């Protein structure tokens, strides 16, 4: 009797992606062996480490991050393409991950990216592993796109935030999907909602027009108890809204067999220094799904 293959589809989610580490560790702990891994964006970075038996090294690296470590890894770009070049963080990632071809991974692995010219998803099932990861992680506007075979490639989440279809195409009989964006609306409400006291509102509205203009430009100190979202927050939150709609549509037509959803609304897009909290959320999410996961262990598939 042929052994049933279990596939893991790791979704996008930026800093929440460290939850994938907790999910994988928890699955291993209960005896569920993953045969196939497909990743999108941060899911490709974590998935590749697992596929190459380097997950422990990745966990050691990311759990050592401080807030200032993350800032130092952000190499601002003054050129076109994105706010960050992305070279600094991926150069350090190369110290953990071997330079290898995708087909040489210990487990079947693939990453998804988006072709900006065609608008279609591109599946990396062979070739340069680091190229695939770098392309899949290129959040539009935030990180510079990757040139490949005459095309510009960006984050796979633009077209396929949770690569369930790719996991099945690689031969998975059962797909466990990890969704990191299901509770993003909680963070969006916190980010985009605010209260202005009546007193402050009246004071602000009573300012002459030229003073209000200077206030908006930041030339004088605002009298309102309001902190407007930054340009990066607006961009990333908008992308999350679009990704969530796309994700729901795709999963309606191609649902996973088991869906794991770590809860970590307190971790925002660039909170990569909060790996401990994200990993714990991933482990807890697996524990909550044990009723669905235990049959995979009991049947020894």
Swiss-Prot record:
PROSITE patterns: PNPLA, UPF0028. The keyword NAD does not apply. GO terms for biological process: lipid catabolic process; phosphatidylcholine metabolic process. The active site is at residues 41, 155. Keywords: Hydrolase, Lipid degradation, Lipid metabolism. InterPro entries: Acyl_Trfase/lysoPLipase, LysoPLipase_patatin_CS, NTE, PNPLA_dom. A motif (DGA/G) lies at residues 155-157. A motif (GXSXG) lies at residues 39-43. Belongs to the NTE family. This is NTE family protein RssA. The lineage of its organism: Bacteria, Pseudomonadati, Pseudomonadota, Gammaproteobacteria, Enterobacterales.
């Amino acid at each position: 009797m042929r052994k049933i293959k279990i596939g893991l589809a790791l979704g996008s989610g930026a800093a929440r992606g460290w939850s994938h580490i907790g999910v994988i560790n928890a699955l291993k702990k209960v005896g569920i062996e993953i045969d196939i891994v497909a990743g999108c964006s941060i899911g490709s970075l974590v998935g590749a480490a697992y596929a190459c038996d380097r997950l422990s090294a990745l966990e050691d690296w990311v759990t050592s991050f401080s807030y200032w470590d993350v800032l130092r890894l952000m190499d601002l770009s003054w050129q076109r393409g994105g706010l960050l070049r992305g070279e600094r963080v991926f150069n350090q990632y190369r110290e953990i991950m071997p330079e290898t071809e995708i087909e040489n991974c210990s487990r079947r692995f693939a990453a998804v990216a988006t072709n900006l010219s065609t608008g279609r998803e591109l599946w990396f099932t062979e070739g340069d592993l680091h190229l695939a990861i770098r392309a899949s992680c290129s959040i539009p506007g935030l990180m510079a796109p990757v040139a490949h075979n005459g095309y510009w490639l960006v984050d796979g989440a633009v077209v396929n935030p949770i690569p369930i279809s790719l996991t099945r195409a690689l031969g998975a009989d059962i797909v466990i999907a990890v969704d990191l964006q299901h509770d993003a609306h909680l963070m969006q409400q916190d980010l985009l909602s605010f209260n202005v006291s009546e007193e402050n509102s009246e004071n602000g509205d009573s300012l002459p027009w030229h003073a209000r203009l200077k206030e908006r430009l930041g030339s004088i100190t605002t009298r309102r108890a309001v902190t407007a979202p930054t340009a990066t927050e607006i961009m990333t939150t908008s992308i999350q809204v679009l990704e969530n709609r796309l994700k729901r549509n795709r999963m309606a037509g191609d649902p996973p067999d088991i869906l794991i959803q770590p809860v970590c609304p307190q971790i925002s897009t660039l909170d990569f220094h909060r790996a401990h909290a994200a990993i714990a959320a991933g482990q807890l999410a697996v524990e909550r799904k044990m009723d669905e996961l235990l049959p995979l262990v009991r049947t020894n598939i």
